[in-house]
Amino acid sequence: MALIMEPVSKWSPSQVVDWMKGLDDCLQQYIKNFEREKISGDQLLRITHQELEDLGVSRIGHQELILEAVDLLCALNYGLETENLKTLSHKLNASAKNLQNFITGRRRSGHYDGRTSRKLPNDFLTSVVDLIGAAKSLLAWLDRSPFAAVTDYSVTRNNVIQLCLELTTIVQQDCTVYETENKILHVCKTLSGVCDHIISLSSDPLVSQSAHLEVIQLANIKPSEGLGMYIKSTYDGLHVITGTTENSPADRCKKIHAGDEVIQVNHQTVVGWQLKNLVNALREDPSGVILTLKKRPQSMLTSAPALLKNMRWKPLALQPLIPRSPTSSVATPSSTISTPTKRDSSALQDLYIPPPPAEPYIPRDEKGNLPCEDLRGHMVGKPVHKGSESPNSFLDQEYRKRFNIVEEDTVLYCYEYEKGRSSSQGRRESTPTYGKLRPISMPVEYNWVGDYEDPNKMKRDSRRENSLLRYMSNEKIAQEEYMFQRNSKKDTGKKSKKKGDKSTSPTHYSLLPSLQMDALRQDIMGTPVPETTLYHTFQQSSLQHKSKKKNKGAIAGKSKRRISCKDLGRGDCEGWLWKKKDAKSYFSQKWKKYWFVLKDASLYWYINEEDEKAEGFISLPEFKIDRASECRKKYAFKACHPKIKSFYFAAEHLDDMNRWLNRINMLTAGYAERERIKQEQDYWSESDKEEADTPSTPKQDSPPPPYDTYPRPPSMSCASPYVEAKHSRLSSTETSQSQSSHEEFRQEVTGSSAVSPIRKTASQRRSWQDLIETPLTSSGLHYLQTLPLEDSVFSDSAAISPEHRRQSTLPTQKCHLQDHYGPYPLAESERMQVLNGNGGKPRSFTLPRDSGFNHCCLNAPVSACDPQDDIQPPEVEEEEEEEEEEAAGENIGEKNENREEKLGDSLQDLYRALEEASLSPLGEHRISTKIEYKLSFIKRCNDPVMNEKLHRLRILKSTLKAREGEVAIIDKVLDNPDLTSKEFQQWKQMYLDLFLDICQNTTSNDPLSISSEVDVITSSLTHTHSYIETHV
């Protein structure tokens, strides 16, 4: 720093005075006192409240303003070379642990009384303030580029902000000291975990690099051009550049980038200055200006420009919102903009510095919106008059969201202006800490390059995207498509994490340097990428998806689990191990035994040694293997990854555990960093099927399965507006299993009749509860078994009557009706045959899909259904084609390899199926549980009119049931011939609400009023239940 600027500690008294001239206007009255006392730079850095009072600064607010600016100078003087993201994380972690230790020490003292509700002591609040100050310093780094553009750091920033807000709320709550301390301890532990996560990312060069200073000179500035910089000021006086305008002097020098802090202007330190004083300093010399900028870490490669160094854009006021040519990479301004002469202090947070104005800007309204005329001028691309608002006003929001404006076949990239911002907000707060930043403005056009993804995978996933944004080079390379989505989850065929898979929201971009990205494209695509591809232009794209045909060859090669234990061969280490499952309920098994095979630094596990497909695998070089001392199970070890998840295993004996640990460490140690998993391979993959298994010992009190546990195809997950958002918790593995089961079912229905129906897989059996919630399959029908076992297994499907066929293949809407109104009526003679066939009522053997009860579903052909049921929308037919092609690709080499399932304990499986179906061993329905009551309100029908009627029916049924209970209580009293006054008084006190309700209802016996009251209650209940359905 000594070569670029003189340290603040060596300032002379005249330099201190020059620096104070740029502070707030209210502080100018004290400059003479500083000049008279000859305060040097070293004295300035160590100044205190008492010394300020001796200098005549008697007001506390003025003292705080000076000390805030001095704090910024201290950070610049002492922390420039040592401050980085890791050190700031260490400081925050230390502050959190200090606060924890302080609370623990207070509780150990003999005078501690946690039951009091008095205010916390001052030393306690001081520790809280120190913790928040350390968090602010960390947020000052996370809140701007390059960290603000990385998803992981953006999520971390949001977590830290949320925890700090929670901490400030806790200390102001009126509760006991013990409760307050418990809440603060929880926040401190969470903050420590966040800091440990940042510290663990030591391999990321951005975490360990510190900031540096750089001197930039802008010369030959034209009077009509201006500097072309966007500057945003924090409340305490940091000045951050948020971008440059296209072809401006700041853009042409190629050294000014978003996130840079302005430290000096013409060798005068401007840290802590007002923004208007900074602007005056920039305009002081019309021929040029010398800037000293503080730059955040960008990239490890200093020879190649980082992607963030290409940030430039036109002011939004100069950008017409009309479709642009796909080949135009550089656009020219269509009009000029003037500069404000004077604005209030609250509006000086953001400033664009173009040529001098012809007249003042038009003020905003109280919400900060532009006048309608100006906005209409922007929308149609007309030139803006000279009195228009600064273009940077569009970039001056605290929280900005991007959204798509679709006009015919054009997708535009725009900003949404925040309307809730107050214009009277002060520029500074009273805390002396520094670095409290607002999020920086982001550009309209920028060379963001997303993570590379397999083009075949992107084509397969394209039908699940809601919107597409394409950035294409001048050569129009088809593989360079980067899709952006905001609020959607990708439904993939496996529950696998990929090395390059991150959120594809607009806030996440790759930080690979340009040369590395070029090398990556040339290596994968095999096509040369010239330098012109570094600058991507916006491409209009139609919202119509591309071809929905899936790549058959790519599907078969993606999964590493689709390999049998025999084909895998003898591994480096084999044996039985216990694996801990993610328990979904209290009664579910925590551990399950698998056959494990260690092969080529990958760990596979199978159900048995003859299994045709691995239940899961992990790539060990990406995981850390160690003893799992936190597990209660003996001889446990774990494979953990800070960004993915942890797997826990356990051996039977200590020798087995040591053997596995030694063998795994030997294999993984030989893999160098460059030989680890490639980007298109998986970190890990695991099936969720074992997690849905019920315990081996059935429990009578275990709750039944929820209605929405049957997975849905991806096409139905977000397409229908009537699907609950709660169902998004289903894993992608379950979705894949559901698709494959439907495809196998359809193939067996339309295939040869030589396949025995007893060999149906258990995944095809479904209960009534599953059927209620399950949407249409690819064939548009539900497969439902309603016949007795003897008819379903040992009879030919052609001998079934059309009524039975129609009843066994019901669409979703009819299943809803059948659930509420009873089964569809059969012919009287047929019903008697069914009842008399086994001497009882017909039984349904549609067991839950995860049970081991080996019965089959009826192969009802689609042609036997109701003609109305055969009508499918085009989307369903297209999905059926895609799934058939996918099934054909997946089943290459496996079509004739069906193996016999092992028959389990039929009685045990039957009991388990009855338990999950909420039936007693005698076939009677059990008392509903809380889960059933809760999920009974989220049953949905695809027809909104029918859905509303079903809601009304449920409400009336529940109301009728409640009234019947009240009548039974009343009858109990009225039917008692020996009723005494004392007993009646006790009954009255016990059912006081019911008694008052009776008294009120007896006063109004008018039938019209009663019916209107019922309608009002019903309508209100309908509204309430609709709200619950939307938001639960």
Curated annotation (Swiss-Prot):
Where Phosphotyrosine occurs along the chain?
A: Y683
Q: Where is the CRIC domain?
A: 84-178
Q: Where is the DUF1170 domain?
A: 332-515
According to its UniProt record, how is this protein modified after translation?
Answer: Phosphorylated on tyrosine.
Q: Where is the composition biased (Low complexity)?
A: 324-340, 730-740
* Domain PDZ intervals: 215-297
List the residue ranges forming a coiled coil, or say none: 874-917
Name the residues that span the membrane: none
Question: Does the entry feature the keyword Cytoplasm, yes or no?
Answer: yes
Q: Where in the cell is it found?
A: Cytoplasm; Membrane
Oligomeric form and interacting partners: Interacts with RAF1, RAB2L and RAL GTPase proteins. Interacts with DLG4 and AIP1.
- Protein name in the entry: Connector enhancer of kinase suppressor of ras 2
